[in-house]
Amino acid sequence: MTDTQVTWLTQESHDRLKAELDQLIANRPVIAAEINDRREEGDLRENGGYHAAREEQGQQEARIRQLQDLLNIAKVGEAPKQSGVALPGSVVKVYYNDDKSDTETFLIATRQEGVNEGKLEVYSPNSPLGGALIDAKVGETRSYTVPNGNTVQVTLISAEPYHS
């Protein structure tokens, strides 16, 4: 498994997501009972409560699958140990298109992790910018394509392990 297939999580984020998953799983019998109660009300074609409970069940099961998938590929508390290389879990500073005054600092991670709570912008390692920077060394310039089809050059100024 490569680092771009792994989701880096702080221990706090992992614990929060695991608690949410546990709560959703514990809630399964409640929704199942609600569906059963609504089913007993009669004609299912005109039973809004039944359909609402089924919709809620579908949304809950989708979130359970999403959390299970995320937690299965997560690296917990393993921020990159090295500085100078852009990896998932790194705070990077870059400039764009040879304009050294146009700098940006951000975290390479996934937004749903809940890391840094708005202190830094977060770019996924699977995004065009994040993907272009993975394994880049300080001073290295990479290119990526933006949604309008243009190519942007980005140069890595610094890369440090994330510390919450």
From Swiss-Prot:
Residues spanning the membrane: none
GO BP annotations, alphabetical order: DNA-templated transcription elongation; regulation of DNA-templated transcription elongation
InterPro entries named in the record: GreA/GreB_C_sf, TF_GreA/GreB_CS, Tscrpt_elong_fac_GreA, Tscrpt_elong_fac_GreA/B, Tscrpt_elong_fac_GreA/B_C, Tscrpt_elong_fac_GreA/B_fam, Tscrpt_elong_fac_GreA/B_N, Tscrpt_elong_fac_GreA/B_N_sf
Any one Pfam family match given in the protein's UniProt record, by short name: GreA_GreB_N
SUPFAM superfamilies on file: FKBP-like, GreA transcript cleavage protein, N-terminal domain
Domain of life: Bacteria
Coiled-coil portions: 50-75
GO molecular function per UniProt: DNA binding; RNA polymerase binding
Entry keywords, A to Z: Coiled coil, DNA-binding, Transcription, Transcription regulation
Cited NCBIfam families: greA, PRK00226.1-3
Function text: Necessary for efficient RNA polymerase transcription elongation past template-encoded arresting sites. The arresting sites in DNA have the property of trapping a certain fraction of elongating RNA polymerases that pass through, resulting in locked ternary complexes. Cleavage of the nascent transcript by cleavage factors such as GreA or GreB allows the resumption of elongation from the new 3'terminus. GreA releases sequences of 2 to 3 nucleotides.
Protein family: Belongs to the GreA/GreB family.
Protein name from the UniProt record: Transcription elongation factor GreA
Name of the gene encoding the protein in the UniProt record: greA
